[in-house]
């Protein structure tokens, strides 16, 4: 109506029935999600859904994922071992059948960047995974493996998705890095480091305490 240039609409945590951890089920806020997606697609819009990989007990894949997850709970949910092909298959199949086939063609993959520098909200370095990885190794690979899983869900569908952590030399993934950086020093560090990934970065400048910053 106002000729605002926009072709990707992103839905944040409220689309889930439970967001921390995630249910991957549509909230009552969206009573007819498939019809909504069809209408938006017909108008030329792409729909991008926010999520993270920690699966709430109400998630349809929770039971199947129990034996393919790390040994800690995060926000009351399990976290899949995406280095395990079966975990990727379960996660990707659900996303494809429930969301992608309905018209979703992008995802915003959050909360996969925890480290010693970002607090203790995620799984610890001492975690163990069915694939044999430990928590330290999995923190480094989490974002890249998450992207790989979502690419399997999307099949050959074109996408421009977002991820909060990915490794170096990741230019083969159609994702954009983003970050929740609240400190100016962290922001500058991100500027310097982002090019190693080989993909675009969209920074969020949250705070400036001086004119110089």
Regions found by a protein language model. Name each.
Residues 3-213:
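Aromatic- and carboxylate-enriched substrate-binding clefts and catalytic-loop regions
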């Amino acid at each position: 109506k106002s000729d605002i240039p926009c072709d990707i609409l992103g839905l944040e945590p409220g689309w889930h029935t439970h967001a921390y951890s995630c249910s991957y089920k549509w909230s009552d806020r969206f009573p007819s999600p498939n019809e909504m997606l069809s209408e938006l697609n017909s108008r030329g819009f792409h729909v991008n859904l926010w999520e993270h990989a920690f699966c709430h007990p109400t998630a349809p894949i929770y039971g199947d994922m129990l034996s393919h997850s790390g040994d800690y709970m995060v926000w009351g949910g399990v976290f899949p071992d995406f280095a395990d092909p079966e975990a990727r298959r379960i996660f990707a199949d659900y996303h494809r059948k429930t969301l992608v086939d309905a018209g979703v063609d992008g995802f915003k993959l959050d909360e996969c960047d925890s480290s010693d520098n970002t607090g203790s909200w995620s799984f610890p370095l001492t975690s163990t995974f069915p694939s044999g990885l430990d928590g330290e190794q999995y923190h480094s690979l989490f974002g890249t493996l998450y992207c790989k899983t979502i690419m399997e869900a999307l099949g050959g569908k074109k996408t421009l998705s977002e991820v909060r952590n990915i490794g170096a030399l990741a230019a083969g993934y159609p994702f954009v890095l983003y970050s929740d950086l609240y400190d100016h020093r962290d922001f500058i560090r991100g500027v310097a480091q982002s090019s190693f990934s080989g993909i675009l970065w969209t920074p969020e400048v949250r705070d400036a305490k001086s004119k110089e910053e």
